[in-house]
Amino acid sequence: MSKLNVTNARRKTRVRIALRRTANGRPRLSVFRSSKHIYAQVIDDLKGETLASASSLEKSMREAGNTGANIDAAKAVGKLLAERAVKQGVKEVVFDRGGYLYHGRVKALADAARESGLSF
């Protein structure tokens, strides 16, 4: 494993450990960001199941002409995820940025999810 991969894995683990301490049974909003797409899901760690998910690969996103590599797509994914989570009865989550900096696409997704009804 390269030094960069080890550093990223440690950062991701450190963030997840801190989240477990503060979660208090709340579901986790997990974000994965690749160079071309962005994915997000609300996970109930106590049951081990995904409650809601959204990504820039979905048909509705592709038809709108959004690629996942920009802030507009991240906002759309955040809004879609929040709507699906609220429909499932989830209103409070813990934000898991997954070791990514809270900046750019990750921040845009989080802000859109907040505006659409999720609180964290």
Curated annotation (Swiss-Prot):
Belongs to the universal ribosomal protein uL18 family. This is one of the proteins that bind and probably mediate the attachment of the 5S RNA into the large ribosomal subunit, where it forms part of the central protuberance. Transmembrane segments: none annotated. InterPro entries: Ribosomal_uL18_bac-type (IPR004389), Ribosomal_uL18_bac/euk (IPR005484). Pfam families: Ribosomal_L18p. It comes from Rhodopseudomonas palustris (strain HaA2). This is Large ribosomal subunit protein uL18. One of its GO terms (biological process) is translation.
